[in-house]
């Protein structure tokens, strides 16, 4: 949010070389497009931007509920079951807290769910025009919250599997749709990330690799793990001299160490199962 404010005002005084804020975008450059999205709210609503963002999050919670009902309906559920399904899916969301959360925790799932509804209508044989919905919403979701790409990849896999039902024509149709559904969000994110770095006094960075996030996900959270790795992808990146390639090599090595530990030390299985 602070970066969004800086983008809107043009004041980047806090982003001096080697400051925490400067290092943050070197480590996590994928947050740049998110800041650009939030900048829209600051430019549109000024001092009321954070309230507008909270309202956007609250409305997104309702959009999630509506999308889940529509998806359940398409899967053949009766009206009462649709509502029950949607409510059960939302029980884990503490809406009052997440509505103002500045990582797009509610807007992103609303976008991917409605995009998923469009994908569902498409694979059920409806008009190809239903693809417009995910082709618009999936890129927006990927910009608001990068992890939305996990859902996009899942949607692409679903489209490909469904393509087998239609013979070679259906498969070609499915492959084209899947490529578009993945390529457009990735292209939009990449373009916005380049634009972001063109606007800020921070050198372009490819940041911490995905493998570092995987390693962070399987570590024990202490120095207990192989090699004494404490699980911080931030530290892994900067210990590798802010080099994405070197950080990736270190992360791959760490993942291998954990895997070998699990294979050769049965006591580690307990930790693995807990994870």
Labelled PLM ranges:
Residues 55-76, 114:
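Transmembrane-helix motifs of polytopic, lipid-linked glycan transferases
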Residues 194-275:
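Membrane-proximal stem/loop segments at transmembrane-domain junctions that anchor or position
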Residues 28, 32-39, 44-63:
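Loop-to-helix entry region of an early transmembrane alpha helix in multi-pass inner-membrane enzymes
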Residues 67-70, 107-124, 134-138, 155:
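Specific aromatic-rich, kink-prone transmembrane helix
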Residues 11-35:
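Membrane-proximal lumenal/periplasmic loop motifs of glycosylation machinery
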Residues 75-76, 112-131, 160-165:
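Membrane-interface transmembrane helices that cradle and orient dolichyl/undecaprenyl
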Residues 130-145, 177-185:
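Membrane-interface alpha helices of multi-pass inner-membrane proteins
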Residues 53-60, 84-114, 119, 144-151:
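Multi-pass, polyprenyl lipid-linked donor-dependent membrane glycosyltransferases
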């Amino acid at each position: 949010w602070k970066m969004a404010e800086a983008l809107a005002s043009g004041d980047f005084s806090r982003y001096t070389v080697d400051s925490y804020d400067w290092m943050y975008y070197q480590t996590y450059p994928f947050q740049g497009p998110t800041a650009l999205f939030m900048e829209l709210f600051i430019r549109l609503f000024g001092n009321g931007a954070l309230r507008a963002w909270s309202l956007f999050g609250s409305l997104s919670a309702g959009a999630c509920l509506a999308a889940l009902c529509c998806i359940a309906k398409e899967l053949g559920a009766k009206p009462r079951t649709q509502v029950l399904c949607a409510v059960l899916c939302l029980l884990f969301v503490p809406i009052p807290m997440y509505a103002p959360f500045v990582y797009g925790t509610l807007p992103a799932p609303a976008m991917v769910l409605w995009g998923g509804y469009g994908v569902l209508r498409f694979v059920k044989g409806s008009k190809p025009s239903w693809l417009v919905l995910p082709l618009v919403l999936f890129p927006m979701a990927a910009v608001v919250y990068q992890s939305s790409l996990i859902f996009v990849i899942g949607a692409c896999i679903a489209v490909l599997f469904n393509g087998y039902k239609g013979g070679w024509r259906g498969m070609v149709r499915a492959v084209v749709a899947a490529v578009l559904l993945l390529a457009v969000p990735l292209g939009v994110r990449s373009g916005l990330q380049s634009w972001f770095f063109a606007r800020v006094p921070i050198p372009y960075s490819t940041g911490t690799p995905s493998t570092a996030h995987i390693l962070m996900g399987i570590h024990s959270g202490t120095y207990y793990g192989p090699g004494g790795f404490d699980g911080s992808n931030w530290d892994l990146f900067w210990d590798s001299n802010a080099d994405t390639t070197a950080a990736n090599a270190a992360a791959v090595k760490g993942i291998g160490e954990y895997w070998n530990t699990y294979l050769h030390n049965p006591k580690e299985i307990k930790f693995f199962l807990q994870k």
